[in-house]
Amino acid sequence: MYEVRFHGRGGQGSVMASGMLAAAMVEEGKYAVSIPSFGFERRGAPVVSFLRMSDREIRQLTNIYQPDCIVCVDPTLTKSVDIFAGMKAGGTLVQATHHPLSELALPDCVSTVGLLDAVKIALEIFKRPITNTLMLGAFAKTTGVVSLESLKRALEDSEFRDAGLAQNMTALERGYAEVAVHHIERRAAA
């Protein structure tokens, strides 16, 4: 089983991204379940969403406390939320940020990092900092667990139409093309 935890802010579409990723996994013949976490959060408040994917039926519908991968769609969130809490050793981070890898403080559990200046690109495409579809493209390239084509089909099957569909398709493709993927070698303690 592969578990993903999405971190974002209300209104950025992290819950929608989790659902779209689940649809793409089903498109590939896998089992997937998206688990949104709703409370009384308002637009701009930190939110979290969860996704499990597997080759077998998934019966566990709880929150994810030890993710294999963390997708953070908001570059400011790491200042106020411990997004790395419980992350498994050898984990993957897909982060929206304009900072290079050398400027990020990453815990030892992270071994693969996908960095994307998603806010800049979102402002070019949408004229708003909505980064969710960009980060799905970045997730696909960074992890390799889902194909870009399956994400495109899931996007086509979503509620987006006309200009919104075209913009989100562009965002998905640019996220995939422009993410910088880094593999971090960690030395074992002596």
Swiss-Prot record:
Molecular function (Gene Ontology), one example: NAD binding
InterPro entries, sorted: Oxidoreductase_gamma_subunit, PadE, PorC_KorC, Pyrv/ketoisovalerate_OxRed_cat, Pyrv_flavodox_OxRed_cen
Reactions performed catalytically: phenylglyoxylate + NAD(+) + CoA = benzoyl-CoA + CO2 + NADH
Major enzyme class: oxidoreductase
Activity modulation: Activated by magnesium ions and thiamine diphosphate.
Subunit architecture: Dimer of heteropentamers composed of an alpha (PadG), a beta (PadI), a gamma (PadE), a delta (PadF) and an epsilon (PadH) subunit.
Function, in words: Involved in the anaerobic metabolism of phenylalanine and phenylacetate. Catalyzes the oxidative decarboxylation of phenylglyoxylate to benzoyl-CoA and CO(2). It can also react slowly with 2-oxo-3-methylbutanoate and use different electron acceptors such as benzyl viologen, methyl viologen, FAD or FMN, but NAD seems to be the physiological electron acceptor. Also catalyzes an isotope exchange between CO(2) and the carboxyl group which proves partial or complete reversibility of the oxidative decarboxylation reaction.
PANTHER family (alphabetical): PYRUVATE SYNTHASE SUBUNIT PORC
NCBIfam families, A to Z: PhenlGlyoxDHPadE (NF045762), PorC_KorC (TIGR02175)
Protein name according to UniProt: NADH-dependent phenylglyoxylate dehydrogenase subunit gamma
Gene this chain is encoded by: padE
